């Protein structure tokens, strides 16, 4: 039940499922199907960061996402843990990471994940087109 509650909280709050205000049933179904996949993925990352924080990030997140985030932060890809990856995604979404702040919320995680996802899409496009920066 707790996991199910967390899933719906992620779907509702983080993914803003209610705010989509789709009027046609088919559009709502398609939107919820996509958002549910994202919510499950984010919930898996959260559980990995909480339950097994020292687990290598490449085992719980796509390797490209870890590599892009590491490059963005100017750090080596090796040695990233699930918890470190989770908090860095949250920082992309505006999380400050101070001690009294507690854990990041779903909206912050969702914003950070969307930014990271856009960065990985950009890297993938640049690689397929043979583009280079600098």
Map each language-model feature to its residues.
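A short, flexible helix-boundary coil/loop motif
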Residues: 13, 18-23, 33, 38-134
């Amino acid at each position: 039940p707790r996991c199910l509650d967390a899933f719906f909280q992620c779907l509702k709050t983080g993914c803003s499922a209610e705010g989509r205000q789709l009027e046609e049933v088919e559009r709502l179904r398609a939107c919820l199907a996509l958002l549910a996949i994202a919510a499950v993925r984010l919930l898996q990352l959260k559980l990995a960061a909480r339950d097994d924080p020292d687990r290598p990030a490449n085992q719980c997140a796509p390797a490209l996402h870890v590599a892009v985030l590491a490059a963005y932060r100017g750090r080596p890809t090796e040695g990233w843990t699930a918890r470190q990856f989770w908090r860095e995604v949250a920082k992309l979404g505006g999380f400050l990471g101070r001690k009294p702040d507690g854990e990041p919320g779903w909206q912050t995680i969702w914003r950070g994940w969307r930014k990271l996802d856009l960065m990985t899409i950009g890297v993938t496009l640049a690689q397929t087109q043979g583009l280079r920066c600098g």
